[in-house]
Amino acid sequence: MLTATKDLVLAQSDNSWPTHFRASLYLGVPFIGAQLAQLAINTTDVLMVGQLGATQLAAIILATQVFFTIFIFGSGFANAVVPMVAQAQGRGDQVSVRRSVRMGMWVVLLYGVLTAPVLWMAEPILLFAGQKPEVAALAGEYLHIAQWAIFPSLIFMVLRAFLSGLERAGVILYVTLVTLVLNAALCYVLIFGHFGFPELGIFGAAVAALGVALLGAALTIGYIRRQPELHRFELFVRFWRPDWPAFGEVVHLGIPISVTILAEVSLFTVASLLMGTIGTIELAAHGIALQFASIAFMIPLGLAQAGTVRIGLAYGSGDMVGVKRAAIAVLTLGVGFAAVGSTIFALFPHELAGLYLDTRRPDAAEVLAFAGPLIVIAGAFQLVDGLQAIAAGMLRGLKDTTIPMILAMIAYWPIGFFCAWAFAFPLGFGGVGVWFGFVLGLASAALLLNWRFFRLLRRVSAAPAAS
């Protein structure tokens, strides 16, 4: 067993700074590319359905938000598999790798079954929430098909966690790029009825989403089965055999990850509602700034995933020096990339905002005037957002998820939301105040999570995992 991972352990024992920076980039770049490709898939759906009319556009935005909320919570269980695999691989325990991945698939399949009624009943739920009947009906129609994509999508996430833990991130990028191309083609053909296919409208977008999810899972399974060096893990042999301790660990680690992700996503949702109460122009400007911040966030998110893997591998092999250097490497890269992005945001805010606006429209100048300052603030926002995301990823590498969840929720809501509300309304800063609150909340999360990581590192260094 140890022989099978000899090369990996030797690579982990090379603690030179160039090795750590190279390894972080080697893992991080494919993760970043895959995140950007996934963002492009979601954008493609909205852009194409938007050509059908305002009602269809509103319906797919609602439907994808419902699906995304269910999916993002479930992805926490898949993310829990990453440190489990990385630590087991670091100590040369391929049996634990297999059990972690299998039970990860069990958990997400069970989660899919439990959440299926919510997706199936989306139309009455949306009607109860006050949505227009025609919009709720279309959203429900979309989700009746797209809901089945939750199963292959989450299976893909678990298998992605397996490959990530083995530092095989490149294939994840390739699979995501293939699904990006297929999604665009299927949407074009099925939504609008080209090449002899019927015009299915929003229903066609749902069929495309399901087809792409199935393809992503199938390609990943095919890759794993065709790689001789991965056969020793026997992921799909006796798949029905349970391992309840591993099942419990996936749930124990995954729920805090899911809650943390959901808490951050919901903060942005509520912030949009706050901006909407200030004014339509402010909400439009907020949407533009948030779009740029979301794109920039893909970089630290990819580095955070790389940090989880690198730290998990080093910790599993008992290499505390490697843990510390892996952490410093991803943090340094995160700050470096954020500094470049922040500089671009600060120098060209109006030019960036103009990419989303038809300057010939009478309200464009107003939106541009509001969006410019928000994009400048988004530069500071992406720095602290990146630092807190990377810190959360590093803590996951140590399998520490519960305390980070509590710290993050304190930073997001009692600090972030309260400051956003206070700056916007009592202090009278309006939309700019909402973003000031964002920055303070995420800066608090960055400080708390990094403090937690380095404090925990000092503690575990006295009793490493491999001892």
From Swiss-Prot:
Protein family according to the UniProt entry: Belongs to the multi antimicrobial extrusion (MATE) (TC 2.A.66.1) family.
Species whose genome carries this gene: Rhizobium meliloti (strain 1021) (Ensifer meliloti)
InterPro entries: MATE_fam, MATE_MdtK, MdtK-like
Localization terms from the record: Cell inner membrane
Described purpose of this protein according to its UniProt entry: Multidrug efflux pump.
Membrane topology annotation: Multi-pass membrane protein
GO biological process, one term: monoatomic ion transport
Pfam families: MatE (PF01554)
Primary localization: membrane
Membrane-spanning parts: 20-42, 57-79, 107-129, 144-163, 170-192, 202-224, 250-272, 292-314, 326-348, 368-390, 403-425, 429-451
One Gene Ontology term, aspect cellular component: plasma membrane
Lineage top rank: taxon: Bacteria
Stated name of the protein: Probable multidrug resistance protein NorM
Keywords noted in UniProt: Antiport, Cell inner membrane, Cell membrane, Ion transport, Membrane, Transmembrane, Transmembrane helix, Transport
